[in-house]
Amino acid sequence: MKVYVYYYDGFAEFEIAHICCALGKYLTAAAAENKIITSIECQKFLPDTTLSEVNPDDVDIFVIPGGDPKNEYKNQQLKDFLFKLNAKGKIIAGICGGAEIMAFYGLLDGKRANGDSNGFVVTPRNEYIYNKINIVNQDVVRDGNLITAVSQAYCEFAIEVQKAAGVFVNEQDAIDTLRWYKNIK
């Protein structure tokens, strides 16, 4: 199992913390450039590799955290990479702004999805992006190989990504893990 998380300046580390902890032994951090990345929490991260060094055939799951993704909208390298992954049926998981990146690139066109902080909201300024998506009022949505989630559902998002990775022995294992994440006794 090879799981990649994508780092970009302004990403929200908390949205992927459970994924990184649970899948750490399978995890590689990738970024557009080999440089220190600063999260919205002002933590510094050094990626393991760059996108240009990653072979899409070697990726099982690619996770895009939210945060402040506006600088990624023009990242043609990321867009091309995601479309290669999608063509190969690889799992692409985006939460909050990560799902927004997927939507902006057109990756979610014709798909069931949700994202941003409180769910995708169509406005006159963004309808050219979101009108092609079947926006679902759910915290986490899986449509084929694509997983999207709203920010506050980072625990549920982590569970869905772990399900895609096949780490749970059964559904009760997933439920118990979610209860542990949320401190539900």
Name each model-derived stretch.
Residues 40-42:
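N-terminal strand-loop element at the rim of the active site
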Residues 2-6, 10-11, 17, 21-35, ...:
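Active-site-adjacent pocket-lining segments in enzyme domains
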